[in-house]
Amino acid sequence: MKLLVLCIFAMMATLAMSRSWHYVEPKFLNKAFEVALKVQIIAGFDRGLVKWLRVHGRTLSTVQKKALYFVNRRYMQTHWANYMLWINKKIDALGRTPVVGDYTRLGAEIGRRIDMAYFYDFLKDKNMIPKYLPYMEEINRMRPADVPVKYMGK
């Protein structure tokens, strides 16, 4: 019983922190805006990975490096809905109709501000870099604009 109560409190805290106690209904986002976001976010993550690999990547195999590129794409997919909440606030604050450049700027800011180096260090130090599987290769081969995301906008 104590475990059940603890799980319920954990779930409530998670919901409170992730969605501020209200459901954000997904709406359509213009494809050009979505592409601008994805390209810039992944480019920022990949730039950070290249810098990290220059310093720490000597002991990693080629397959492990590919897996880390997949981690970048999966991280973007996983946190897409939260990015959209932040992006919607920024776009609403503009006070005008957004253009592709606004989404490009915000995507670049996300890619630059999220420091994935700590995550790479953790995966490497704990020997938790995922095994490279065919579905990872499929996502890595996709252009950043084609990486699927589930939350489509405001």
Curated annotation (Swiss-Prot):
<protein>
    <recommendedName>
        <fullName>Egg-lysin</fullName>
    </recommendedName>
</protein>
<dbReference type="InterPro" id="IPR035916">
    <property type="entry name" value="Egg_lysin_sf"/>
</dbReference>
<feature type="signal peptide">
    <location>
        <begin position="1"/>
        <end position="18"/>
    </location>
</feature>
<keyword id="KW-0732">Signal</keyword>
<dbReference type="InterPro" id="IPR001379">
    <property type="entry name" value="Egg_lysin"/>
</dbReference>
<comment type="function">
    <text>Creates a 3 um hole in the egg vitelline layer through which the sperm passes. Does not have enzyme activity. Species-specific interaction between the sperm protein lysin and the egg protein VERL exposes a basic surface on lysin that may dissociate the egg vitelline layer via electrostatic repulsion. Plays a role in ensuring species-specific fertilization.</text>
</comment>
<keyword id="KW-0278">Fertilization</keyword>
<dbReference type="GO" id="GO:0043160">
    <property type="term" value="C:acrosomal lumen"/>
</dbReference>
<keyword id="KW-0968">Cytoplasmic vesicle</keyword>
<dbReference type="GO" id="GO:0007338">
    <property type="term" value="P:single fertilization"/>
</dbReference>
<dbReference type="Pfam" id="PF01303">
    <property type="entry name" value="Egg_lysin"/>
</dbReference>
<comment type="subunit">
    <text>Monomer. Homodimer. Molecules associate into dimers and then rapidly dissociate again. Interacts (as a monomer) with the egg vitelline layer protein VERL (via VERL repeats); each VERL chain can bind multiple copies of lysin.</text>
</comment>
